[in-house]
A protein has these predicted regions:
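Acidic, low-complexity central loop/insert segments
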Residues: 37, 65-195
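N-terminal, positively charged, Ser/Thr/Ala/Gly-biased leader segments
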Residues: 1-17
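Short beta-strand-to-turn element immediately C-terminal to the catalytic PLP-Schiff-base lysine
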Residues: 23-26, 50-51, 170-173
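Short beta-strand micro-motifs enriched in acidic
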Residues: 11, 51-53, 115-119
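Generic N-terminal amphipathic, Lys/Arg-enriched alpha-helix
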Residues: 16-24
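Hydrophobic N-terminal alpha-helices or hydrophobic patches in metabolic proteins across all domains
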Residues: 6, 28-43, 47-56, 90, ...
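Conserved phosphate-donor
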Residues: 43-61, 188-200
């Protein structure tokens, strides 16, 4: 069965300049394995799958997949999907009593409001992200972090695992100069992501 999808660059007005995203406009009937296969096929950081809203509160339902797994929330896929659905005329924002126009995205992270301002080329969409929480405080010599932090001059604060719809590690470096000079070990970051069920 043919499926309509759009590939776009979020946060950019020209191709190749923003955050790449694929949006499958009608994902009804696709199972988890099919969605994961499509996300792998696109080879983009994220692919979203749009489904009918499950309640009157929501404008639509969304599932977000990286090439490796489903993720509960991601900012640029949420904003990009809203733009695509608005451009296609598949959703319309609801005007609130205070004049704001909102879409409500329903997904693993819950129902999230997206504020829509303007129209066409001047349209903006802003998402209220899930509140981030500290999941774990680690020691700098934690074996899981050793490869990802190797050679980096750390600051005073310990590394922390955050969860804001997606899990990721944060580590304070000693200075802005250290940050600018850092050369990430991507293989070590991938290993960290796999070992801790995080984005790295």
């Amino acid at each position: 069965m043919a499926r309509r999808f759009v590939q776009l660059d979020v946060f950019a007005s020209v191709p190749g300049a923003g955050n790449p995203l694929a949006v499958v406009l009608d994902a009804e009937g696709l199972d988890d394995a099919a969605m994961q296969a499509i996300a792998r096929w696109t080879r983009l950081p994220e692919t979203t799958f749009v489904l009918p809203a499950a309640s009157d509160e929501a404008s639509y339902r969304i599932r977000i997949f990286s090439p490796r797994r489903e993720v509960p929330f991601a900012g640029h896929p949420s904003v990009g999907t809203a733009h695509v659905l608005l451009d296609a005329g598949l959703v319309a924002p609801r005007r609130q009593a205070d004049g704001r126009r909102l879409l409500v995205q329903d997904g693993i992270a819950g129902k999230l409001p997206l504020e829509v301002a303007g129209e066409g080329a001047t349209r903006t969409v802003a998402v209220r992200t899930p509140r981030a929480r500290v999941q774990e405080i680690a020691q700098p010599d934690d074996a899981r972090l050793r490869g990802a932090l190797a050679g980096l001059p750390l600051g005073q604060l310990p590394p922390v695992l955050m969860d804001g719809g997606r899990r990721w590690w944060l580590a304070e470096l000693a200075s802005e100069t250290a940050l600018r000079a850092a050369t990430p070990d991507w293989d070590a970051i991938v290993a960290l992501a796999e070992a801790t069920d995080s984005m790295g």
